[in-house]
Curated annotation (Swiss-Prot):
This is Protein RecA. The gene is recA. One of its GO terms (biological process) is DNA repair. Keywords: ATP-binding, Cytoplasm, DNA damage, DNA recombination, DNA repair, DNA-binding, Nucleotide-binding, SOS response. It comes from Chlamydia trachomatis serovar A (strain ATCC VR-571B / DSM 19440 / HAR-13). It comes from the Bacteria. HAMAP family: RecA. One of its GO terms (cellular component) is cytosol. Belongs to the RecA family. It is found in: Cytoplasm. ATP binds at residues 67-74. One of its GO terms (molecular function) is damaged DNA binding.
């Protein structure tokens, strides 16, 4: 078949498909603008936003946050909700664990008066509510807390001790098949919080796994593994927070397996000032000599906590350091592009 004939045959096939399934059912990827634009919601931790590679969690996708107990899963999800609201968006929280603290959510920055919350009786109801909210197209982010608490209706109606093999996994697989396309069409972000369990009889490799079967692992565009790695001491040697380490276990939108660390303080959630300090020291924007932190010719303070308080007071300095960090990250990406351009010029010159 000649090239003109193939072109006419393709045009006829496209015309028939659009007639059969509607306009826009098939198109060139380059002309599909939404394929290039990924809108995101910030996580509240600049180090995690940079590790994700796209500046936050993506809208129109499924995100899984998993980790052990008291590792900051709900805190991270609530920060994402708060940031979505600050952008003028609408957020919904499906509290299957019946454990969301409104006072703590408000302390983090969530507008609890505008935050929609549902506490369904069974897993099918929770996932149906999430699908209906996403289908409305009016919700920016939906948090499901947690997958482990999504109890299938038949298990709820049965007796304690009854065996229900694979029931939750089948429920999740069926729901995610419907939910994925709806989220992409309405540009809604769904965040599933998940717990970890240990496989029995595993001698080699990682014995940890997440609940709900394999479907969520496949359908998630981003999987965030969050762990507590230490405590933060305050006055009189009391714990005032936790040091958190996050690993991007899966990422369909940027290189995976990047890590980030940040602080979660009990009285404010994720410490954005702490993230700025860590990144600024790492990028040599802030000079750390002993216990003193210096920025240009200015002494910021002695000790990390003193600098944190200074950045919380001085928002102008906070945003200046944040801008310097972004500029440093962008500058570090330039040499790779420059090398490609130089190589292209060499190839072009050799061809001459």
């Amino acid at each position: 078949m000649s090239v003109p004939d193939r072109k006419r045959a393709l045009e006829a096939a496209i015309a028939y498909i659009e007639k059969q399934f509607g306009a826009g059912s098939i198109m060139s990827l380059g002309k599909h603008s939404s394929a290039h634009e990924i809108s995101t919601i910030k996580t509240g931790a600049l180090s995690l936003d940079l590790a994700l590679g796209i500046g936050g969690v993506p809208k129109g996708r499924i995100v899984e946050i998993f980790g052990p107990e008291s590792s900051g899963k709900t805190t991270l999800a609530t920060h994402i909700v708060a940031n979505a609201q600050k952008m003028g968006g609408v957020a919904a929280y499906i509290d299957a664990e019946h454990a969301l603290d409104p006072n703590y959510a408000a302390l983090i920055g969530a507008n609890i008066n505008d935050l929609m919350i549902s506490q369904p009786d069974c897993g099918e109801d929770a996932l149906s509510i999430a699908e209906l909210l996403a289908r409305s197209g009016a919700v920016d982010v939906i948090v499901i807390d947690s997958v482990a608490a999504l109890v299938p209706k038949s298990e709820l109606e049965g007796e304690i001790g009854d065996v229900h093999v694979g029931l939750q996994a089948r429920m999740m697989s069926q729901a995610l098949r419907k939910l994925t396309a709806t989220l992409a069409r309405t540009n809604t972000c769904a965040i599933f919080i998940n717990q970890i369990r240990e496989k029995i009889g595993v001698s080699f490799g990682n014995p940890e796994t997440t609940t709900g079967g394999r479907a969520l692992k496949f359908y998630s565009s981003i999987r965030i593994d969050i762990r507590r790695i230490g405590s933060i001491k305050g006055g009189e040697n009391f714990d005032i927070g936790n040091r958190i380490k996050v690993k991007v276990a899966k990422n369909k939108l940027a290189p995976p397996f990047r890590t980030a660390e940040f602080d979660i303080l009990f009285n404010e959630g994720i410490s954005s000032a702490g993230c700025i300090i860590d990144l600024a020291v790492e990028k040599n924007i802030i000079d750390k000599k002993g216990s003193w932190f210096n920025y240009q010719d200015r002494k910021l303070g002695q000790g990390r906590e003193a600098v944190r308080e200074e950045l919380k007071r001085n928002k102008e300095l906070f945003h200046e350091l944040e801008r310097c960090i972004y500029e440093s990250v962008q500058a570090s990406q330039v040499p790779a592009a420059a090398c490609v351009d130089a190589e292209s010029r060499q190839v072009a010159e050799a061809a001459k």
